[in-house]
From Swiss-Prot:
Name assigned to this protein: Chorismate synthase
Organism whose genome encodes this protein: Phenylobacterium zucineum (strain HLK1)
Gene Ontology biological process: amino acid biosynthetic process; aromatic amino acid family biosynthetic process; chorismate biosynthetic process
Lineage, opening ranks: Bacteria, Pseudomonadati, Pseudomonadota, Alphaproteobacteria, Caulobacterales
A Pfam family assignment: Chorismate_synt
Cystine bridges: none
Chemical reaction(s) catalysed: 5-O-(1-carboxyvinyl)-3-phosphoshikimate = chorismate + phosphate
Binding site for FMN: 135-137, 247-248, 291, 306-310, 332
Length: 377
């Protein structure tokens, strides 16, 4: 199996399966001299950790991370940097799996669960780890969150915040989105008034043994103008690819996204004026990216997640012999996978932006052209 790595200069390779002994990642391209310990990574993993509410999977995993390589500490690093730092070599991270229940999946060893990757994995490789979905499980995203924690260390001036803005048919009013309150409820909701609505909806879904979809919004503020490159290194294209790679993601919008198709040119074009500290945009339909290059506006995106395919309702399917069967999925599953996707979405944005920063420095030296400056003679 190839294609387990993403990024160009800041490269992340994830490894491991849902019911294997461990999973993790290797981060290559992180510059040397960046202070880094497990304590810098663990809080981000704790935000994603399963078993923290009745509307998410009850699998109990501590998600304790260990750094195996790529860091060093002695008297000189302590004196210069204050402790352990990156060395510029590959950083290997490991997270042990401790709460596997593989017996829940014994009945589907030769059957294909509708909506899952079981059949395409079998069609491509001829062999698959059916326990919890193996490599295709959302358990893999723990490694992405760990990598994202390292990426954030390269982005001290950038703030990345995500929120669930829709569960099932119930969406947050865009005018009421407040990212600062997402930590006050179990749904990452940016509007407290939507919480009881989602609770009632999810309770109905859970009791029915079914599932529901969600939309996650993310914004990155503090991204300077100039990151990204035309034509095939567009920042929005890199973001879209990274976000679409997340398990259960079925759609990505940058800025106004598909809504832009219904706008006029006057409505969609973000007008500009000159402010005291540089250009000011009067709107942000572009989502902070024009021509594939950041504008200095907040970079914004939305990701649509499908309903969890593991449901208790019997469904028609096939087995490996081609026989028609009726299948009822067992195991511990999220009735709405989008709820726990917020830290994953944030992490993927962080990795893309860290990569964009390093590529920008490599191409231009990191400088930016400032409006109003006279060219050197």
């Amino acid at each position: 199996m190839s294609h387990n790595t993403f990024g160009h200069l800041f490269r992340v390779t994830t490894w491991g399966e849902s019911h294997g002994p461990a999973l993790g990642c290797v981060v290559d391209g992180c510059p040397p001299g960046v202070p880094l310990t497990e304590a810098d990574i663990q809080p981000w993993l704790d935000r994603r950790r399963p078993g923290q509410g009745k509307f998410v999977t009850q699998r109990q995993e501590p998600d304790a991370v260990r750094i195996l390589s790529g860091v060093f500490q002695d008297e000189r690093t302590t004196a210069k940097f204050g402790g352990q730092v990156t060395t510029g070599t590959p950083i290997s991270l490991i997270i042990e799996n401790t709460d596997q229940r593989s017996r829940d999946y014994s009945e589907i060893a030769t059957s294909f669960r509708p909506g899952h990757a079981d059949y395409p994995y079998f069609a491509k490789y001829g062999v698959r780890d059916y326990r919890g979905g193996g490599r295709s499980s959302a358990r893999e995203t723990a490694a992405r969150v760990a990598a994202g924690a390292i990426a954030r260390k390269l982005l001290p001036g950038v703030t990345i915040r995500g929120a669930v803005v829709q569960i099932g048919p119930h969406a947050v009013d865009p005018g009421r989105i407040d990212f600062s309150v997402t930590g006050d409820n179990p749904f990452w909701a940016p509007d407290p008034e939507i919480v009881p609505v989602w609770e009632r909806h999810l309770e109905q879904v859970r009791k029915a043994g079914s599932s529901t979809g969600a939309v996650v919004a993310v914004e990155a503020t503090g991204v300077p103008a100039g990151w990204g490159a035309p034509l095939y290194g567009k920042l929005d294209a890199e973001l879209a690819a990274a976000l679409m790679s997340i398990n259960a993601a079925k759609g990505v919008e940058i800025g106004a996204g598909f809504a832009a198709a219904a706008l006029s040119g006057e409505e969609n074009a973000d007008e500009m004026r000159m402010g005291n500290e540089g250009p000011l945009f009067l709107s942000n339909k572009a989502g902070g990216v024009l021509g594939g290059i950041s504008t200095g506006q907040p970079v914004t995106a939305r990701v649509a997640f499908k309903p969890t395919s593991s449901i208790l309702t019997p469904r028609r399917s096939l087995d490996e012999a081609g026989r028609e069967i009726e299948l009822r999925t067992k195991g511990r599953h999220d009735p709405c996978v989008g709820i726990r996707a917020v830290p994953v979405v944030e992490a993927m944005v962080a990795c893309v932006l860290a990569d964009a920063l390093l590529r920008h420095r490599a191409q231009t030296g990191g400088g930016a052209h400032v409006l109003g400056e006279n060219p050197k003679s």
